[in-house]
Amino acid sequence: MVASSWRGCRRAVAYCARMLGVLTDTLDVTLTHPDAVLPARSRAGDAGYDLRSVERVTIPPEGTRLIPTGVAIALPEGVAGLVTPRSGLALEHGLTLLNAPGLIDPNYRGEIKVILHNTAEHRYTVEIGDRVAQLLLTPYWAPDLQVVDQLEATDRGVSGFGSSGRS
């Protein structure tokens, strides 16, 4: 038990050291299309970087299309990219990401593409330069998984789906 705990502690320390090394002020980005725009945050303090379309794409009612952004990024080890929906597109036009959030692994170097789904009863056309999603950069933890006979007990236990009440 002690050896196992020590191994976990060493991994946690190594992870923190890695994170301190990867959280820099810059991130390498390649624009892979002439109409590509560098992802940017709309306001200081915003967490997400806007991703824009490099093609005009019409999405039929209840249809799904793959929207290219013309952007590729080099995420450092220990950091993942989450592609998330834009709330305004969802509320005003019924557009969302089919696989929200989309996951970009740090070893992926290809173009970021957005799986946009139209839940509305009318078609929607994405124009070149339209903001179609947001990119959130986040650290992650990827420990080795181990099978145990029983999980440590908590106050909640196995209660889920509505177990905390309505109000």
Q: Which functions belong to the PLM regions below?
A:
Residues 2-167:
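DUTPase catalytic domain/fold
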